[in-house]
């Protein structure tokens, strides 16, 4: 209570690694993708049960992977990826679906946007703080509606939004808070 001059410092995204890439997949319609830990608390069935056109991809690993692979054989589970391989795979998506109801901030949202991929999520803390309707994605209590609306969002708009969260921008913001101009 005796603190003064407090300023938030945003998390950043590596916009050199996570950036738009050439499409190397030729799927059947749009690709809806989740990336992250494959665990119960991520609420993945809320995404995987959706009736969506095209394909569903899950990038990642975790304790629920085996069960979900058996339950959803039509879903493409890539397994864990990292670095360039992760960034290229993510950039193939047409929409990034974030079904979690409990994450306070998902860096994966920024990574998707930096890749030019709009986000579909529930309007809960975390996504609500960073997703702007029609600018970089869509929020809705009906995740299917959010995903379908996100398909119409400009990839360039997502990229422009994410550029404000590059590590360069976040570092300058942090340094300016330490030593104001």
Language-model features, listed with the residues they occupy:
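Donor nucleotide-sugar binding/catalytic pocket of nucleotide-sugar-dependent glycosyltransferases
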Residues: 1-21
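Short hydrophobic beta-strand element within catalytic cores of glycosyltransferases
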Residues: 118-121
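Conserved donor-binding/catalytic core segment of Leloir-type glycosyltransferases
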Residues: 20-57
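Short alpha-helical donor nucleotide-sugar binding micro-motif in glycosyltransferases
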Residues: 80-81, 88-93, 174
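Aromatic "clamp/platform" in nucleotide-sugar-dependent glycosyltransferases that forms part
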Residues: 101
């Amino acid at each position: 209570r005796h603190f003064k001059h407090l300023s938030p410092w945003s998390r950043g995204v590596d916009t050199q690694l996570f950036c738009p890439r050439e499409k190397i997949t030729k799927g059947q319609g749009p690709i809806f993708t989740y990336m992250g830990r494959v665990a119960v608390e991520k609420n993945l069935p809320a995404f995987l049960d959706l009736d969506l056109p095209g394909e569903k991809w899950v990038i990642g690993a975790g304790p629920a992977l085996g069960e979900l692979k058996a339950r959803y054989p039509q879903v493409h589970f890539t397994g864990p990826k990292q670095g360039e391989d992760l960034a290229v795979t993510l950039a193939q998506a047409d929409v990034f679906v974030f079904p979690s109801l409990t994450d306070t901030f998902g860096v994966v949202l920024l990574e998707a946007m930096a890749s030019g991929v709009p986000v579909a999520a529930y309007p809960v803390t975390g996504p609500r703080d960073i997703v702007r309707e029609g600018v970089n994605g869509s929020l809705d209590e009906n995740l299917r509606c959010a995903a379908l609306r996100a398909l119409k969002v400009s990839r360039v708009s997502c990229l422009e939004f994410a550029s404000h969260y590059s590590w360069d921008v976040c570092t300058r913001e942090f340094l300016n808070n330490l030593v104001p101009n």
